[in-house]
Design a protein with these regions (language model features):
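Outer-membrane beta-barrel "beta-signal"
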Residues: 56-58, 156, 248-277
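Structural signature of outer-membrane beta-barrel channels/translocons
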Residues: 62-64, 77-79, 127-129, 157-161, ...
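Cleavable N-terminal export/targeting peptides
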Residues: 1-30, 48, 262-277
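Transmembrane beta-barrel architecture of outer-membrane proteins
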Residues: 41, 120, 150, 208-210, ...
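Short glycine/proline- and aromatic-enriched beta-strand/turn motifs that initiate or cap beta-hairpins
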Residues: 25-76
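Transmembrane beta-strands of outer-membrane beta-barrel proteins
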Residues: 31-37, 57, 66-68, 86-88, ...
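Outer-membrane pore/translocation modules
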Residues: 28, 70-171, 179-204, 239, ...
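C-terminal/domain-terminus segments
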Residues: 225-256, 273-276
Length: 277
């Protein structure tokens, strides 16, 4: 499912780094707290042909290796001197309604499909910051409640512009999921088919899409900042062949204003991991 929460999940890891400007000092811990508010114009659900405006809260805190984030959840990350890093998070997924919803994915044309419940998950990511402006990462997200399957992504991030005031970042990710995951979000079982009128569809596991994000962050001073992002998602055949997918090419826009409370002087770096020997 690449809509609202899922698309935000692509954007927020970059937004987290850009807005909190985590210090990368081998001899000192880092910490900051950022709040903000924004808006997002995105598909009602992955594959929807209708868009919706949503309010996007921003809440991000960091103390050394540990962090909390309104989109990612809570977790920690570590990086060695070679640039390899590891991240572990405990997060959530808002699921999907079978009617129009203002704070989660859902649309009236899904009536009869039933709701996909809110669930807890854990995510494991391993990546390499090859250069100050280039990083690659592999990530797996596993459900802890309401078995909805496992999703994976392989991504790389480029940062062509990075100054004291402005950061521009581009991220592209290939998206994968197991059979259970794809059928949770794109499949139509016999009971759903009977209730909704959609034809049956059993989605095979594997590659199901590509997500691209372009993000511009501007810092007015030590506290006030803005973040603008544009996202484009293309759904592969495993998702696009589902009868509930009405549009395979999706776009989303996000804008947010942030306020950062600094606990110490920091400099913006990516990916913002705490280094270990």
């Amino acid at each position: 499912m690449i809509a609202i929460k899922k698309a935000l999940y692509m954007t927020v890891p970059l937004l987290t780094v850009i807005t909190s400007c985590v210090q990368a000092n081998d001899n000192a811990s880092s910490g900051s707290f950022t709040i903000g508010l924004g808006g997002r114009y995105a598909p009602r659900y992955s594959g929807s042909d209708k868009q919706v405006w949503q309010v996007v809260p921003v809440l991000q805190g960091r103390n050394g290796a540990f962090f909390i984030d309104s989109q990612k959840g809570v977790g920690y990350d570590l990086q060695n001197t070679s640039g390899w890093y590891f991240e572990h998070t405990l997060g959530y997924d808002l699921g999907r309604k079978d009617k129009n919803a203002s704070w989660r994915a859902g649309a009236n044309n899904l009536k009869g499909m039933g709701d996909i419940d809110v669930s807890l998950n854990t995510a494991l990511a391993v990546g390499w910051q090859a250069l100050s402006w280039l990083s690659v990462e592999g990530k797996a997200t596993l459900p802890l409640t309401d078995s909805q399957g496992v999703s994976y992504q392989a991504s790389f991030t480029l940062i062509p512009v990075q100054t004291d005031q402005d950061t521009i970042a581009f991220q592209t990710a290939a998206l994968f999921g197991d059979n259970r995951y794809l059928n949770t979000w794109y499949g139509v079982n016999p009971e759903q088919s009977r209730r909704s009128g959609y034809s049956r569809y059993s989605a095979p596991g594997g590659f199901y899409g590509i997500d691209n994000s372009l993000i511009w962050s501007h810092q007015f001073d030590a506290h006030w900042g803005t973040v603008l992002s544009a996202d484009y998602t293309w759904l592969g055949e495993h998702a696009n062949e589902s009868p509930i997918v009405l549009r395979r090419n999706e776009a989303a826009l996000t804008a947010a204003v942030t306020w950062t409370f600094w606990s110490e002087s920091m400099a913006c770096v990516l990916p913002g991991k705490v280094k270990i020997e």
